[in-house]
């Protein structure tokens, strides 16, 4: 009320038959207090008047007193009277609580008890009260529970607050407001459990304003009302509601949260505020600085209480509660009330009245939200998301939830160009988060991609669609996510992408769907019937990418190439083809240890740290038409040089091959070359037929013996001093048909009639070209060969 404005006139309260005539109930137009007026004597008072003694019913007759005789009877009567004044015996828990806190009747309330409006007092036992509770699924557990307030006018709120309520467009209280308001006005502890978007914020703010008006504390001595919230977004949202509905009543408020400078927050505290909305972490920091006093707090609210306790704020909350006097009123407003949290909450509340909207023990989703659960693979998520976004009306607000901050940023960048999206998560600074939320509220950025940091308590109007791109890590978070739409009586739509890795939540998700009368997909029911296992039968011998391993799942989660498919990329491609890698000739090439050891020089250049070699390799790949042939020829020449360097190793390999008759491991594909018949007359070291590679002693099939002295052709090879720098690393197509062993024999027995290209044609030389200038990078093994003279 501004200065110079006449105070509002009082108004009559609803008729109360229990009032003696001619008393009438009045409501103060300025403060909203209920008081009583006698029009005959013009006397007003806050205490409810009692009827005259002549109108009181006669008391019941007392039983005749027992006969008394002697001193012992008088002592016995004295003990009986003292016992009758002693309160009933209670358990140790009640005694411990009363030692720290006084009873509800002796809390920090004003000297005159503020009664409920007469309409609520007389309707507590009215049949319409039970009908109202049954219609709105209200369950109340506690003592002396008043009837719900069905209209704002009967709540006893001052005209300033009523004007703000009417300006906000509220026609009647929500069920949680209607039942929790009269309980809170009686200075009782409250546990209010209701679905998201049910108006819990005003459920504790308006009684808190009435509490402030009754006490008339000095704001400079500290706040009177303290509200704790788990996240910065929820805290700022509560502050906005407190400022909007408390401005006309001259109620000052401030918000304390991390991620913002402390200077402005400390200045607000120094000026004095009535209401403090804070996160536990920042409030503890300011308490350690001794810049705030909570000795005057008598109205404590824990919004999203289960969330704060689940997030690990229990030590901070207990530390804050120790700074608050025990004579206080505590209220917990939340959407869920798990059994694990009830034990902790018993230490913070005294004889609370529990008000539940809907089911008591199970999670309940808003029935006004249409839930669509789609079983989908990770690689199909982005394409389906784009289809949903294109089907929405232009300018519709869509909220998308992801589980990781990295995915949140990447998905926002992908959608920004087409739809205009922004991201919000815990790594964003407070200014960035406020800017993103401002753009989302105004419609400048109609799509918001968020993590669970924005899932609890975020109240943004006109959110049409909520999309769970990644299923949350708990079914409680799912209820809070979809609760961002369908608020304040509106309807909404929720889409949920459900993958095989989320199968452990299938049974709980079905309960949520059935509780809200939503359709349950058949695939989801089948998954739940299998005990939460995946929906597809997995092949034991499938590759990792086929089984949906970690790499393929990660790549598909981030959209794959171009953000559309879940291609696993180069790493997964090599893994998936490791066991089944087929060449052009149809034979299987095992990419095991042997292949990695015999990688050609071009492959080694590929992993070279030198940018120059990498560029050369990229140019050679564009000019080479037969990379596999170049690799085969280079592999065999390298094997022959490694055998020829060590005479001891050569003799050792010869003895091993002669004694055992077993084939040496091929440096190439590791396969044995078998011939249809064996001829022991052939000499192993001097082959006349290059197609025969049998062992001379036992006639068993063996490998080509590469342990020999270098030939003149080898001495003039690429590592010899006479090398002219122009050579190739591939063999002719005709020699390649018989495999790598034949290529080795061609290099061992060259054709005299062939041109001096070391057994290769010009076509082969062009195909195996490595560099534009024909140079080959130095190799330490080549230098060792040159120093040894090229032969042993």
Swiss-Prot record:
Per the entry, what this protein does is:
ATP-dependent RNA helicase involved nonsense-mediated mRNA decay and ribosome biogenesis through rRNA processing.
Enumerate the residues binding ATP.
Answer: 194-201
Q: Which residue ranges does the record assign to the Helicase ATP-binding domain?
A: 181-355
The record's annotation in PROSITE patterns points to:
DEAD_ATP_HELICASE, HELICASE_ATP_BIND_1, HELICASE_CTER, Q_MOTIF, WW_DOMAIN_1, WW_DOMAIN_2
Q: Does the keyword Electron transport apply?
A: no
List keywords of the entry alphabetically.
Answer: ATP-binding, Helicase, Hydrolase, Nonsense-mediated mRNA decay, Nucleotide-binding, Nucleus, Ribosome biogenesis, RNA-binding, rRNA processing
Specify the enzyme's EC class, one word. hydrolase
Q: Where is the composition biased (Low complexity)?
A: 1-16
Q: Which reaction does it catalyse?
A: ATP + H2O = ADP + phosphate + H(+)
The record's comment about this protein's domains reads:
The Q motif is unique to and characteristic of the DEAD box family of RNA helicases and controls ATP binding and hydrolysis.
Residue stretches of biased makeup (Pro residues): 52-68
What is the top-level taxon of the source organism?
Eukaryota
Q: Which PANTHER family match?
A: ATP-DEPENDENT RNA HELICASE DBP3
Q: What is this protein called?
A: DEAD-box ATP-dependent RNA helicase 40
**Which one GO biological process term can you cite for this protein?**
rRNA processing
Compositionally biased, Polar residues: which spans? 725-739
The EC number(s) this enzyme carries = 3.6.4.13
Residue ranges constituting the WW domain according to the UniProt record: 17-51
Basic and acidic residues bias (residue ranges): 70-80, 88-108, 543-560, 572-588, 668-708
Q: Which SUPFAM superfamilies match?
A: P-loop containing nucleoside triphosphate hydrolases (SSF52540), WW domain (SSF51045)
Residue window of motif Q motif: 150-178
Pfam families named among the record's database cross-references: DEAD, Helicase_C, WW
Q: Where is the composition biased (Basic residues)?
A: 589-599, 609-654
Where are its TM segments located?
A: none
Compartment(s) = Nucleus
Positions with biased composition (Acidic residues): 764-777
């Amino acid at each position: 009320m501004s200065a110079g404005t006449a105070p509002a006139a009082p108004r009559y309260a609803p008729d109360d038959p229990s009032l003696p005539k001619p008393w009438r109930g009045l409501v103060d137009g300025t403060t909203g207090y209920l008081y009583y007026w006698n029009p005959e004597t013009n006397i007003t008072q806050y205490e409810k008047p009692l009827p005259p003694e002549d109108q009181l019913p006669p008391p019941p007759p007392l039983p005749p007193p027992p006969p008394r005789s002697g001193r012992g009877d008088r002592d016995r009567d004295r003990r009986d009277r003292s016992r009758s004044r002693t309160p009933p015996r209670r358990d140790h828990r009640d005694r411990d609580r009363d030692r720290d806190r006084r009873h509800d009747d002796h809390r920090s309330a004003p000297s005159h008890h503020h009664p409920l409006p007469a309409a609520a007092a007389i309707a507590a036992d009215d049949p319409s009260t039970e009908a109202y509770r049954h219609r709105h699924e209200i369950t109340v557990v506690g003592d002396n529970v008043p009837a719900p307030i069905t209209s704002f006018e009967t709540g006893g709120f001052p005209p300033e607050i009523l004007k703000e309520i009417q300006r906000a467009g509220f026609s009647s209280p929500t069920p949680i407001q209607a039942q929790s308001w009269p309980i809170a006005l009686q200075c009782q502890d409250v546990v209010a459990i209701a679905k998201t978007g049910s108006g819990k914020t005003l459920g504790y703010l308006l009684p808190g304003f009435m509490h402030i008006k009754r006490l008339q504390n000095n704001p400079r001595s500290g706040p009177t009302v303290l509200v704790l919230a788990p996240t910065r977004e929820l805290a700022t949202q509560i502050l906005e509601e407190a400022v909007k509905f408390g401005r006309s009543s001259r109620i000052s408020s401030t918000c304390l949260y991390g991620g913002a400078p402390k200077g402005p927050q400390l200045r607000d505290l120094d000026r004095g505020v009535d209401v403090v909305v804070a996160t536990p972490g920042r409030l503890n920091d300011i308490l350690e600085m001794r810049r705030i006093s909570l000795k005057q707090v008598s109205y404590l609210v824990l919004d999203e209480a289960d969330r704060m306790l689940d997030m690990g704020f229990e030590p901070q909350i207990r530390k804050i509660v120790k700074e608050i006097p025990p004579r206080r009123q505590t209220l917990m407003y939340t959407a869920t009330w798990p059994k694990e949290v009830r034990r902790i909450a018993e230490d913070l509340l005294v004889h609370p009245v529990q008000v539940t909207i809907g089911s008591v023990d199970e999670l309940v989703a808003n029935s006004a939200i249409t839930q669509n659960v789609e079983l989908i693979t990770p690689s199909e998520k982005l394409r389906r998301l784009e289809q949903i976004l294109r089907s929405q009306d232009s300018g519709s607000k869509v909220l998308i939830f992801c589980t990781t901050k990295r995915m949140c940023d990447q998905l926002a960048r992908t959608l920004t160009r087409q739809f205009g999206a922004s991201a919000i998560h815990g790594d964003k600074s407070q200014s960035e988060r406020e800017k993103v939320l401002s753009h989302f509220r105004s419609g400048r950025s109609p799509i918001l991609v968020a993590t669970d940091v924005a899932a609890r308590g975020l109240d943004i109007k006109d959110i049409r669609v909520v999309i769970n791109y990644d299923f949350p890590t708990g079914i409680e978070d799912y209820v809070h996510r979809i609760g961002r739409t369908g608020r304040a009586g509106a309807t909404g739509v929720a889409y949920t992408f459900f993958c095989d890795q989320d199968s452990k939540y299938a049974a709980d998700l079905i309960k949520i769907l059935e509780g809200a009368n939503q359709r349950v997909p058949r695939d989801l029911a089948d998954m739940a019937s299998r005990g939460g296992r995946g929906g597809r039968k997995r092949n034991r011998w499938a590759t990792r990418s086929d089984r949906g391993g970690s790499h393929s799942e990660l790549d598909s989660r981030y959209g794959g190439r171009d953000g559309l498919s879940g291609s696993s990329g180069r790493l997964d491609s090599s893994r998936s083809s490791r066991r089944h890698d087929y060449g052009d000739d149809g034979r299987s090439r095992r990419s095991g240890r042997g292949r990695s050891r015999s990688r050609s020089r071009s492959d080694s250049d590929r992993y070279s740290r030198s940018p120059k070699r990498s560029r050369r390799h990229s140019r050679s790949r564009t000019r080479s038409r037969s990379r596999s042939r170049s690799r085969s020829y280079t592999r065999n020449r390298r094997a022959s040089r490694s055998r020829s360097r060590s005479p001891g190793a050569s003799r050792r390999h010869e003895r091993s091959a002669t004694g055992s008759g077993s084939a040496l491991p091929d440096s190439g594909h590791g396969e044995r070359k078998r011939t249809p018949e064996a001829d022991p007359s052939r000499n192993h070291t001097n082959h006349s037929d290059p197609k025969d590679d049998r062992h001379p002693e036992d006639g068993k099939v063996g490998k080509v013996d590469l342990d020999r002295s270098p030939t003149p052709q080898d001495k003039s090879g690429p590592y010899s001093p006479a090398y002219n720098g122009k050579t190739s690393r591939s063999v002719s197509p005709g020699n390649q048909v018989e495999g790598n062993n034949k290529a080795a024999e061609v290099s061992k027995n060259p054709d005299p009639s062939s041109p001096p290209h070391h057994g290769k044609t010009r076509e082969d030389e062009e195909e195996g070209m490595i560099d534009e200038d024909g140079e080959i990078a130095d190799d330490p093994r080549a230098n060792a060969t040159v120093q040894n003279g090229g032969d042993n």
